Amino acid sequence: MKSILPLLLFLSIFSIYGQTTTVEYWLQARMNGVYELENGSSVQFWGYGDNTPPNPGNKVFLPGPQLRFKVEDSAVVHFKNNSPEMHTIHFHGLDVNQANDGVGHTSQDIAPNQTFDYRFKCTNEGTFLYHCHVLTTLHLAMGMYGTVVVGPSNGSSSLSTGLPNYDSEYLMLSSEFDLDWNTNPISPGPFHLFEANYSMINGLSGTQLQNGDHDILGNVNSFIAIRLANIGYGRTKFDFPSNLTVVAYLSDGRLLPSPIQASSFDLYPGERFDLLVSSDQIIDDLVAVSYYDLRNDNQTGSNFVPIKIGNNALTSIDANGLQFWPNPVQGVLYCNNPSNQSVLFQVYALDGKLIQEGNIQPGLNTLQLELLAGMYMMKTPQSLLKFIFD
């Protein structure tokens, strides 16, 4: 999957008692975003972008930058309104006081070219949302939203303290456009009826999700964390392959009384589920996402996200007869290709970001990998293998 834009700067302040950590982000609002549709045409959108000093950008993203904290962190979100209209940031599901709730008339609207610092303490693990709460019907529909992830206070790769660690993590944020609104937004109104006609996962739709950059990748007998969230106006149904074990541990930023194992999950507007997904077999399949109108339950769209579970032993021979060694890798990875055809290889980080790619020629190959130390996925047309780079 395409990585969610990381913000570049945070400040950690440890008190003399060793407890308090302040994590800061800088966001801006703009109303000049250009979104490329699946068919190659473009529409306008409004959104949030990185505003980190000393060199803030001038772009907004769909969805907005993901904000990540740990339980007990003191969060500070510095917000600048670089647009001609009022905007706010409302932190949906997070426990914040009224002054920091981002609901205009009960806290404050942020005027054009003005700033505001949102401050709150992170008290619960889970997945949360943020969005503009000025003329919410329009501003949210135009793309002014993003996600917040709060992890365990100990920094572990788990959904919550005491749960198993996961090897990789993915977000599946559902949303929709009514393209008529994006073509001709009217503020403050009147509005015509919102009719969802363009469905997205993480701001992408249709074939945009099928190019290999947005696959959910994992290994046999390992856990994948999948964070489901719905910021749209309809019901979204996520259907997972039946040979996956899918267990929900958190809902709306709270631990469930008992974990829920299921192959499908229905999410209503603003709802979130945090899942651990695993399998004891190799899988190359799709997560089907269906979108429904809340008024009449008519289906308004669908998307499909590839999910691939592979072997975790890099020294094994894959379906093409390729053999890789050694594991861990120290600079050079060797590969023997017994066929007379070249084979594409791709190296992914565990968050799904494509790091390096090339071709494996017939015979013995020496692959020079330019990576930071850590764990990676090697993808070929017929396999998905995990390796460690020292």
Task: Set out the residue ranges of the language-model regions.
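C-terminal tail/sorting-segment detector
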Residues: 373-390
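Glycine-centered tight-turn motifs at strand-turn-strand junctions
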Residues: 354-372, 389
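Asparagine-centered strand-capping/turn motif at beta-strand->loop junctions
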Residues: 79-83, 228-232, 335-337
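Short strand-edge motifs at loop-to-beta-strand transitions and within beta-strands
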Residues: 65, 114-118, 214, 263, ...
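Short, glycine-anchored, charge-dense loop/turn motifs used at functional sites
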Residues: 347-355, 376
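Histidine- and aromatic-enriched segments that form or immediately flank copper-ligand environments
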Residues: 25, 29-150, 235-265, 285-300
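Residue-level detector of functionally pivotal "anchor" positions at catalytic/ligand-binding pockets or at interdomain
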Residues: 309-325, 331, 338
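Acidic-aromatic/histidine active-site loop/patch
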Residues: 49-50, 166-220, 229
